C-alpha cells in the first residue's frame, strides 16, 4: 500500500469535513480511512485518523468559517498546525503553488535558495520593496520566543504557521526552488540577507501571502509583525506617541517598536545615515535620560542611527508597536462576522449596521483591547472600522479619520468602569469577513454582537414600489409638486406621557434623489397639521433633530421626493434620549401605506373628473362584513371645491355622510373608515365646480383601503 497516497486521502478528508455540509459523505470517507489504517498498520497514521474522527464529531460553525476563509489569490491556507504535517503530499491537497512575480530583468534566472552563512545581521535586499517585513524580522529575532517555527517538508519545500484571517496558525507552504537569481552573478539572489535561513523562508512566505510579488506595497511593520508572531498591532501618529509610557513596556519585553517616515526627510546626512522617505526603521533602544532613540535601517545592517526625540517628532510620521498579549492580558476571545455590502451599505448612515457591546460585568475597573482584523481575500482594497455609537445614532453619518481603517487592522484600547457597557457599530466598504479579537484582564469582560435596545434606536428598510410615484403637494406649499415615496407607522411604546427627545432620518440609496419627510399625528388623516412645517429637499438624506415626541402616541411619517426617485429602496431610522430614565420606552417602526389608511387590501384607480357632471365609480363588495376607507387625490394645484357621496348600489342609501364644498388638503379628499354589510356594492359619486366658462378635466387618483377585498365593477 502506497503510504503517500494514504496520507493524501487523509488530508483530502480533513479538508472535506470542514468544507462539506453533507455529514454522510464525510462519514463514508472517514470509514474508508479507518479501513486503510487497519490495513496499513502504521501508528502515526492510525492516531491521525482517530483524531480526524474526533474533529468530525466536534466540528463547529466557527471552525468551518476559519476553513472557508482560507483561499487567497488562488492559494489555500488551512488553519492547521505544522505539527500535523506527516507527508509532503500535503502540498498536493492544499494548493499554494502560485509563484512570486519578479519584474527585475537582471534577476531572470530561477534557482534554489542559497544560504549566506557568513552574513552578519539581517538586511533588506535593495531590489525587494519590503522594508516593513525586514524590520519585523529584525525585531522578532531579538526575542527568540516570537520566531515562527519552520519545518522542512521536502527538498526545497518548507512549512510554517502565520497569523492571519482570524486564525493563529494558518499553514503556509514555502517553496525555495525558484528564487530570482542574477544572470551575471548566480551567487546573488532576491532574498533578505541573513545567515539564518529561516528569515529567508519567512520573507518568502509573507510576500506570497500579501502580494505574490517581490515588489510589495502598502504594508507596515505592525501588520507584518502580527502576521509573523501574533503580537497585537498598534499603529499611532508620532504626535500621539508617549516615549515614557512605551519605554517602560519596551524595557520589560512587552512590545516591539518600529517607526516610519513620511514624505519629508532632511536632504542632508545629519544622522550619519541619510533618512529615506516612506521607510520603516527598527527601534533598538529608547534612552529616556538623553532623550534619544537608537534605530536600524533595514537596508544597512552594520550601522545604527541615534536620533533625539525632537528630530523623531519632526521627521517621522508613524509609530508601529506590537504588544505581547500573553504579558498584558489573561483572556482572549475571537468573534467573526461576514459583512455584506449589499445588506449593510445601501444607505450611508449608521442605522442597520452590525452593532456590538463591550461590557465589564465585574465590580472593579478592567482593561480591554479590541482588535478588528479584516480577512485577506480577492479584494483587499477595503476600508473597515469599529466605532463607538453616539447617544443618537440615526443622525450620525459614516466617516472615520484614522488611517488604520484602510490597513486591515484597527485597535481600540479602553479602561472599563464597573458594569460599564459601550456600544459600537461596524462598517466595511466591501463584502468582507471580519474577526474581532478581544483581549481583557478579566473573564467578566465580554464583547457581544447584539441589536441595540429599543428606546435607543430602531430602523426599517423597504423597497420603493413604482406605483407609489404620484405627484402631491405639501401643506402651505401647494405651488410645489412633490412625489409620494413611502409612509411609516411610528409609535413610542411604554409608560404614556413620557417625553422622548427624538432624532429621525430618512435616507435613500443615491445622491441623485432629493428627499423630505413630514410627520403627522395618527388621527390627522388629511395631513393638514404637520408636527413641524419645514419644507425643503436634501440630497439622499433628510433628518430632523430634537423632536419632543410623547410615549403612548402614534404618528405617521410621510416621505417624498422632488421627482420620481432613482433609488430602489429607502431607510428610516430613529433614535433618542429618554429624559425620564425611570420609565423605559421603546420605538416601533413599521412600513404602513398611509394612502390606504394602512388597511390590508389596497385598490388603486386612476380616473378623469370633469367639471361638467358627476363621475361615478362602481365597486364590488362580496363580503357580508367589510370596513372601507377612501382617499381621492385630484392632481391639480387649483383651489377647487369638491362634492362626494358614497351610496349603496343596490338601494341608493348613503353609506357615509355626503361631503359638500370640500377643499382638497395635503392628503387629498379623505372619506374616513365606514362599515359595509350584507354584500353591499358601492358607488362613489364625485364632482367639482369650476367658475370658468371653459370645461375642465382633472386627472385623479383613488385609493381604496379595506379589511376584505373590494374590486372595480
UniProtKB/Swiss-Prot annotation:
Active-site residues, Swiss-Prot/TrEMBL: 131, 279, 308
Q: Which UniProt keywords apply?
A: Hydrolase, Protease, Thiol protease
SUPFAM superfamilies from the UniProt entry:
Cysteine proteinases (SSF54001)
Q: What is its EC number?
A: 3.4.22.-
Instruction: Please report the stretch or stretches of sequence annotated as the Calpain catalytic domain.
Output: 74-325
Q: Span of the secretion signal? A: none
User: InterPro entries recorded for this chain?
Assistant: PalB/RIM13_Calpain-like, Papain-like_cys_pep_sf
| Any Gene Ontology biological process | proteolysis
Q: Which residues form a coiled coil?
A: none
Give yes or no: UniProt keyword Hydrolase. Answer: yes
Keyword hit for Protease: yes
Q: MF terms per GO, please?
A: cysteine-type endopeptidase activity
Role summary: Required for the proteolytic cleavage of the transcription factor RIM101 in response to alkaline ambient pH.
Q: Per the similarity annotation, which family is this?
A: Belongs to the peptidase C2 family. PalB/RIM13 subfamily.
Q: What is this protein called?
A: Calpain-like protease palB/RIM13
* Protein species of origin: Candida glabrata (strain ATCC 2001 / BCRC 20586 / JCM 3761 / NBRC 0622 / NRRL Y-65 / CBS 138) (Yeast)
